[in-house]
UniProtKB/Swiss-Prot annotation:
Probably participates in a plant defense mechanism. Disulfide bonds join 5-19, 9-21, 14-27. This is Kalata-B10. It holds the Pfam family Cyclotide. There is a cross-link at residues 1-30 (Cyclopeptide (Gly-Asp)). The presence of a 'disulfide through disulfide knot' structurally defines this protein as a knottin. The lineage of its organism: Eukaryota, Viridiplantae, Streptophyta, Embryophyta, Tracheophyta. Keywords: Disulfide bond, Knottin, Plant defense.
Amino acid sequence: GLPTCGETCFGGTCNTPGCSCSSWPICTRD
């Protein structure tokens, strides 16, 4: 049910709710 993370986040921000850029440059689930 949760949105899939995985977009690139070169700017350091993720558009997908609940995702973070801690594994730069790919968004991963918080």
